[in-house]
């Protein structure tokens, strides 16, 4: 328990007002008359009193520095300036470039102190707010206006939505302060050109922990509040009106409530009335600093002029009442299980040191047993952690296996999509074959394979990751994130008319840090593993359904392959039919040749004179025609054998025909001597030549059609062969993949069953271990209680032994004196 440190500072008087009526002597301030005679009723003593010549540096060194150092060590701290308007509060807290105020000096001193502490690491967060017309505004984030005050069981009183900046050096904080000062409300009155129209609170949250063994040490969290209050004012003096008048009303109201709170807290009687913290936003925020867990200092500033005497007296009365308030400041620590275990070890060592030198071997043995049990407990914890990590690793392997199954299913989907594409391609090809002329359109590009459109992976196999990680927020948590938070209006309704004892309200009981039972944490592990096994079973069911659908698609693909095979057989039959056309033409030419020979024989039999020109002409024509028919047979045989192309067949036939025609013409010219025979021969020759030309053209056109049809059929046959080969490969791949999926499914089922069995065994082992651990912990507590009882009994016996020894000694002395007196 310690009292609030209170100091009074007198600002220098204005040049036109003359000397000050307040006299400062050591730590006492008194009011003197104009003749320099003191007024006995106007004298006050405080922890520190600073006269007109004091500087901000001296105020900080004597008043605030110890609180700043305590805040670095883990204590809550608060410093604020109180007084009337124009008395120097803002100058004391903010200062100037040549003489920085308490806020800037505190910021620099905090970081200097941190650099001197090498065995701990620190994290500092700052926020800057103002209370303007009973509304809380964030000076670091202009958009955060009209913030609300809430209370949490662990955090205590806090402002929801207030922005907090994590800082690393003093310069960064000073820049934030300068940016916040720009957003603060100032105004001009008759008493002050630059008057503060709002209360400002600059807050630093300092967290620290040890560097050597951070996992086994407690975390210290302290809050440092540096408050610059707006000054109380009288309307008659300030001449305020309009907005300034409204601001002055809210300022005077909050300061009046602050005075009431100080008055209630300074009452020394046991039965104190209800303390109205909730009547004002200012007192609600400063509740821990006023009669709570904090080291607090108040700087009361007064004006030395004669016309401000009444306001100065009121300020001194406020300071006198505040001086009687006591706080119970303690280090704020967050204890982990490791830190609690470390402290228990230290307590055991202290008990061991106390028992040294006494006859307590049994107790020493018990302490040793407790230490061994504690060691076993630590080893058991490590073993459980190792098993948990092993289970997590196995779970990760199962997830990887499931992902591999997903990839394989994606590949099967791609194969099925490719097969569907090929089936559509085959259907388009069959339709394109059935043109009105019965021929294929070779210029049609619809059968050209394109890039297949693969299906996207099924979303049912995608495992959603839980992002449990959340970085450090820039703002305090909002009220909806805290389940046990009551808002300000609810607290106001609950506390109206309520009268409570200050001893019950003033102090916050220390919450004991009890270790969380491990059974609660560990019994959730089998449930979680069971849910994971159920999830795996559902995924296996999905894989089975997908496999069935793939089997159906595979059957469809087999049916499509059979249809393609039937189409291929029809195409082969048509190809054989086309290949038989040259044979038929060759047979027709042979028949024509035989008929022609019969006609020639008949004509020769009709000619009696074999030496006549007609006989000679008939003989030459017979030779030429026979040669022509033989040439046609040779060309057809070449076409059937596929030894020549179309271009190599046309030119030899036409050249040979031209040669035969020239030979026929020469023969007729030599053989025909008379004009009548010549005319008859020419007429018959011209008719035969025209007939032969027509036959030649007809044969050429038929030959061209046959070649085109043959080439088209060859192309169709090649394309059908390619489609058939692709279908066979796809069919074989699908069969292999289905077989592989069945094997993978069976292996996955075996793995899941094995994992389930292992999880059950591990869960049973964990339950047994936890039961043993609880038994050991209970036994350890019982032993500690026995040690305490034995220590108390030992101390009692020791006291009785000492008293008995002193009594015997006194009796011995009496006997000695009696013996010496006896003659």
UniProtKB/Swiss-Prot annotation:
Which Pfam families does the UniProt record give? Kinesin
Question: Any idea which positions bind ATP?
Answer: 83-90
| Molecular-function GO terms, alphabetical | ATP binding; microtubule binding; microtubule motor activity
Its family remark reads:
Belongs to the TRAFAC class myosin-kinesin ATPase superfamily. Kinesin family. KIN-7 subfamily.
Source organism: Arabidopsis thaliana
CDD domains found in the cross-reference section: KISc_CENP_E (cd01374)
Coiled-coil stretches: 341-414, 527-557, 696-786
* GO terms classed as biological process: microtubule-based movement
Q: Which domain of life is it from?
A: Eukaryota
Report the residue ranges that make up the Kinesin motor domain in this protein.
3-325
Gene Ontology annotations for the cellular component aspect, listed alphabetically:
microtubule
Keywords on this record? ATP-binding, Coiled coil, Microtubule, Motor protein, Nucleotide-binding
Q: Where is the signal peptide?
A: none
Instruction: Quote the InterPro entries the UniProt record gives.
Output: Kinesin-like_fam, Kinesin_motor_CS, Kinesin_motor_dom, Kinesin_motor_dom_sf, P-loop_NTPase
Protein name, UniProt field: Kinesin-like protein KIN-7N
């Amino acid at each position: 328990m310690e009292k609030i440190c209170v100091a009074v500072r007198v600002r220098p008087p204005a040049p036109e007002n003359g000397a000050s009526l307040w006299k400062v002597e050591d730590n006492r301030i008194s009011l003197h008359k104009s003749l320099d005679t003191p007024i006995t009723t106007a004298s006050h003593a405080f922890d520190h009193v600073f006269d007109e010549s004091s500087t901000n540096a001296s105020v900080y060194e004597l008043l605030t520095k110890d609180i700043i150092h305590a805040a670095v060590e883990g204590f809550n701290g608060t410093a604020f300036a109180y007084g009337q308007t124009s008395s120097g509060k803002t100058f004391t807290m903010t200062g100037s470039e040549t003489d920085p105020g308490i806020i800037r000096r505190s910021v620099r001193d905090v970081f200097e102190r941190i650099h001197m502490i090498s065995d701990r690491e620190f994290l500092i967060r700052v926020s800057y707010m103002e209370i303007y017309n009973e509304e809380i505004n964030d000076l670091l984030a202009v958009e955060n206006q009209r913030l609300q005050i809430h209370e949490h069981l662990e955090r205590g009183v806090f402002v929801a939505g207030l922005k907090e900046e994590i800082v690393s050096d003093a310069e960064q904080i000073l820049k934030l302060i300068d940016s916040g000062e720009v957003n603060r409300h100032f105004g001009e009155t008759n008493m002050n050109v630059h008057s503060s129209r709002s209360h400002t609170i600059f807050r630093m949250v300092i967290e620290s922990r040890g560097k050597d063994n951070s996992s086994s040490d407690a975390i210290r969290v302290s809050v440092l509040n540096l408050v610059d209050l707006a000054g109380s004012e009288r309307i008659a003096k300030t001449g305020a009106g309009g907005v300034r008048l409204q601001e002055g009303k809210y300022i005077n109201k909050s300061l009046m409530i602050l005075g009431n709170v100080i008055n209630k807290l300074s009452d020394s009687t046991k039965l104190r009335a209800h303390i109205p913290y909730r009547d004002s936003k200012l007192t609600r925020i400063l509740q821990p600093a006023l009669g709570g867990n904090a080291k607090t200092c108040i700087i009361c500033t007064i004006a030395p002029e004669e016309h401000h005497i009444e306001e100065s007296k009121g300020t001194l009365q406020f300071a006198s009442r505040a001086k009687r308030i006591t706080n119970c400041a303690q280090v704020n620590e967050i204890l982990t299980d490791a830190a609690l275990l470390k402290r228990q070890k230290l307590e055991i060592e202290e008990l061991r040191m106390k028992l040294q030198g006494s006859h307590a071997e049994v107790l020493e043995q018990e302490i040793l047993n407790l230490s061994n049990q504690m060691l076993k407990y630590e080893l058991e914890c490590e073993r459980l952690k190792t098993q948990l990590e092993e289970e997590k690793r196995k779970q990760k392997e199962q997830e990887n296996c499931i992902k591999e199954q997903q990839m394989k299913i994606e590949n099967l989907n791609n194969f099925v999509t490719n097969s569907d594409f090929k089936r559509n391609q085959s259907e388009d090809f069959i339709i394109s074959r059935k043109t009105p002329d019965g021929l294929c359109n070779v210029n049609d590009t619809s059968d050209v394979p394109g890039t297949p459109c693969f299906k996207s992976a099924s979303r049912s196999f995608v495992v959603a990751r839980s992002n449990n990680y959340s970085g450090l927020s820039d703002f305090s948590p909002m009220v909806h994130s805290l389940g046990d938070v009551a808002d300000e209006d609810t607290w106001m309704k609950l506390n109206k008319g309520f009268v409570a004892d200050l001893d019950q309200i003033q102090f916050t009981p220390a919450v004991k840090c009890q270790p969380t039972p491990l059974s609660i944490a560990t019994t959730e592990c089998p449930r979680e593993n069971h849910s994971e096994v159920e999830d795996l079973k559902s995924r296996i069911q999905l894989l089975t359904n997908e496999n069935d659908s793939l089997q159906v698609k595979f059957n469809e693909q087999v049916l499509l392959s059979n249809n393609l095979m039937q189409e291929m057989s029809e195409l082969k039959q048509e190809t054989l039919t086309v290949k038989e056309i040259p044979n038929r033409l060759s047979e027709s030419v042979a028949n024509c040749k035989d008929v022609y020979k019969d006609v020639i024989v008949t004509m020769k039999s009709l000619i009696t004179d074999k030496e006549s020109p007609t006989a000679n002409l008939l003989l030459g024509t017979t030779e030429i025609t026979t040669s022509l028919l033989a040439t046609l047979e040779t060309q057809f045989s070449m076409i059937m054998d596929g030894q020549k192309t179309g271009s190599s067949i046309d030119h030899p036939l036409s050249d040979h025909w031209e040669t035969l025609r020239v030979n026929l013409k020469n023969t007729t010219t030599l053989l025909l001597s008379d004009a009548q025979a010549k005319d008859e021969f020419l007429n018959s020759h011209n008719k035969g030549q025209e007939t032969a030309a027509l036959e030649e053209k007809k044969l050429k056109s038929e030959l061209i059609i046959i070649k085109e049809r043959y080439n088209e059929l060859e192309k169709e046959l090649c394309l059908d062969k390619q489609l058939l080969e692709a279908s066979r490969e796809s069919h074989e791949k699908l069969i292999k993949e289905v077989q592989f999926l069945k094997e993978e499914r069976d292996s996955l089922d075996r793995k899941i069953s094995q994992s389930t069995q292992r999880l059950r065994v591990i869960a049973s082992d964990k339950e047994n271990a936890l039961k043993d651990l609880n038994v050991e912990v209970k036994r350890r507590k019982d032993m500690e209680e026995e040690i305490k009882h034995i220590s108390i009994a030992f101390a009692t016996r020791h006291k009785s032994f000492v008293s008995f020894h002193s009594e015997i000694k006194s009796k011995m002395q009496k006997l000695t004196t009696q013996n010496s007196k006896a003659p």
